[in-house]
Amino acid sequence: MKAPELSIIILNYNTRQLALDSISSIEKNYSEEVRSGRFEVIVVDNASPDGSLRAFGEYKKQTKIKSFQVVDSGGNIGFSAGNNKGVKVAHGQYVLFLNPDTIVYAKTLTNVSDFIKTNPDVGAVSCRLENKDGEFDFNCHRGFPTPWNSFCYFSGLQKMFPRSRLFAGYTQGWKDNSTNHEVDAISGAFILLPKSIGDKIGWWDEDYFFYGEDLQFCYDIHKLGLKIYYMGTVSSMHIGGAASGIKKKTQNITTANIEQIKKIQKARFEAMKIFYKKNYKNKYPKLLQAFIFKGINVLEKRALASLKIS
């Protein structure tokens, strides 16, 4: 059988129905590609307690997707390790990492795939991501979290001057997000890249459990001398926070309990420290690192203190 052109990897944890909706959107909007085997779909389940694995097995029995694989990761091993499990069984020349709470619109995958095929200097690309209300998800359009960018973001300077090159470096707010252009980093909710590039960087860094891994992924691609591109001319819907439960807008649909949310919040702030140690430790004075880590600890304590059982 001819190898697929694109492997679509969806990592799921406790978001059964959202994942099924995401898969259905692919089957509906790309019926020719999935029926012919040009696109393959790989669903990795991180030991979800909500019956996801069985539901995916049932979906496989009735789907018309020619190549549909279900992978049991064997445990809740995190975002990076879970996606790497999917890579091991992927056969496509290109790979798309897609969050389970994402709905892919018609023509988006085709346009994004065509773009990266014709731009060999681009290592990875994302489309515009919006939530259910059409609100822009800036995570698909970011600068790297340098000490200055991070300070401006958490201090509120970025909100005060959202289009400033000086103060809005993390969100890159001076760029027109309705156009296609280069950015530092895109969101792990939608990342498409050539498999050969992923092989060169060793795929996802498993030192990250949840959060931060997409920034590291993009940073590693930059180190190859390649660009990261954002395509504002095509879009997908990303609900966001469905698995983590840390976003207020999606707390009504998350199945995460208070202990799981605490774990995820801790992983989020730990990821900030990991990224700094890996990429900025030797670029800035030790005193600055101590100051930054103290600030991260304060932010973590505030986030944990704000958690309430609804």
Residue ranges and their predicted role:
Residues 1-28, 32-37:
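N-proximal low-complexity "stem/linker" segments adjacent to membrane-targeting elements
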Residues 24-75, 85:
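Acidic donor-binding segment of Leloir-type glycosyltransferases
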Residues 72-90, 111:
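Glycine-rich, basic loop-to-helix element that forms the pyrophosphate-binding segment
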Residues 95:
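Short aromatic/hydrophobic "clamp" motif used to bind/position activated sugar donors
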Residues 103-141:
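Conserved donor NDP-sugar-binding/catalytic core segment of glycosyltransferases
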Residues 144-183:
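Short, flexible, basic/aromatic active-site loop/helix in glycosyltransferases
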Residues 176-237:
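A short, conserved alpha-helix in the catalytic core of glycosyltransferases
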Residues 219-309:
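Active-site-adjacent helix/loop segment of glycosyltransferases
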